[in-house]
Amino acid sequence: MNIYAVGGAIRDELLGVPVQDRDYVVVGATPEQMAAQGFRPVGKDFPVFLHPRTQEEYALARTERKTAAGYHGFQFHYAPDVTLDEDLARRDLTVNAMAREVSPEGELVGPVIDPFDGQADLRARVFRHVSDAFVEDPVRILRIARFAARFADFTVADETLALMRRMVDAGEVDALVPERVWQEIARGLMEAKPSRMFAVLRECGALARILPEVDALWGVPQRADYHPEVDTGVHVMMVVDYAAKQGYSLPVRFAALTHDLGKATTPADVLPRHVGHEGRSVDLLKPLCERLRVPNECRDLALVVAREHGNLHRVMEMGAAALVRLFERSDALRKPARFAEMLQACESDARGRLGLDAQPYPQAERLRVALAAARSVDAGAIARGIGNDTEKIKEAVHRARIEAVAQALEIGE
């Protein structure tokens, strides 16, 4: 048998970026031979094995044939006579269809095996499909978009983009399972330039199918005195990229993506103002999260940011009572870590505007000081002093928090 490192590891090595995971293909072996050498089978649809020492994945060389719509509609063929070139031919992009042989000691040896000119496309910074079989797997649309977010200086070849459009028009994207769509969107959000992912998805028409609420934001005007970039879609991409540049968490980046969804449904006769867009954003966000089965942590932060971001921007005008009500609505007193992420999302919103990425955001420090003061109130001591009257306790604690915030900020109630 011969073992080869394949795919992203070879690509990243040639690009000079850190290799995170290595995938291996085994040519000339059977499942029985792999098991005899201590490899543990883990593949459900085709033979994949874990190395007995490193626990890395090794797959038998295979070919595949489309048999039904969607991500799972494939029939796989694996046998000792399947060649490395045949295995590489089923891969999505030329830059991912390269290999190097692995020695018995686990070292990469010999030249790069590159039957589809992936090295030339790497130099040209182009994502190009290996063959027309690309159209058989709709996940590849999401993968290319995610790669664009990681390698922001790459472009998609015209002929590849044409295939992607054909797949979208044929309804292939509609057959994707929600969990896989979310997985790829989430991974793309965590890349260096998430806006590139959404640009590619828009260009091929896929964004309108998988995230129509986001796609609808382009072309919606905002007030130029607040938003020099004017276009809401452009603004949201700037917000997401700012959050990515700061290294913020996935929940923060998802909240950045979805905070202004309601602007797409603003009545045309009131544009470019967007009064009440926060509530409309929440109304759109709830079914989106349900449809894609967004994890609770991401959903909950996104909902509270969508609802409250306008209020957070206006905190310099608020008295102590309004600030305490904001903390209570946002559950900040019980969940200060989540509130810190709210601040990150709102700061990204404020700085995700043309020419304003270094704009001061004093609201964040004011809210941090105010929340610390509100949380310093000893609710237990107040309760012990009052007794069993729950309503009186609640009112007294609320009043004490207002007084603490007013004192900390030296403002009126």
Swiss-Prot record:
Catalyzed reaction equations: a tRNA precursor + 2 CTP + ATP = a tRNA with a 3' CCA end + 3 diphosphate; a tRNA with a 3' CCA end + 2 CTP + ATP = a tRNA with a 3' CCACCA end + 3 diphosphate
Location of the HD domain: 232-333
Stored Gene3D superfamilies: Beta Polymerase, domain 2 (3.30.460.10), cca-adding enzyme, domain 2 (1.10.3090.10)
EC number(s) recorded for this UniProt protein: 2.7.7.72, 3.1.3.-, 3.1.4.-
Cofactor binding comment, as recorded: Magnesium is required for nucleotidyltransferase activity. Nickel for phosphatase activity.
Binding site for ATP: 8, 11, 91, 143, 146
Name of a matching Pfam family: HD
GO BP: RNA repair; tRNA 3'-terminal CCA addition
Binding residues annotated for CTP, in chain numbering: 8, 11, 91, 143, 146
UniProt keyword Cytoplasm, yes or no: no
Misc remark: A single active site specifically recognizes both ATP and CTP and is responsible for their addition.
Quaternary structure note: Monomer. Can also form homodimers and oligomers.
Family in the record: Belongs to the tRNA nucleotidyltransferase/poly(A) polymerase family. Bacterial CCA-adding enzyme type 1 subfamily.
Entry domain remark: Comprises two domains: an N-terminal domain containing the nucleotidyltransferase activity and a C-terminal HD domain associated with both phosphodiesterase and phosphatase activities.
Protein name (record): Multifunctional CCA protein
Source organism: Burkholderia lata (strain ATCC 17760 / DSM 23089 / LMG 22485 / NCIMB 9086 / R18194 / 383)
Higher taxonomy: Bacteria, Pseudomonadati, Pseudomonadota, Betaproteobacteria, Burkholderiales
Gene name as annotated: cca
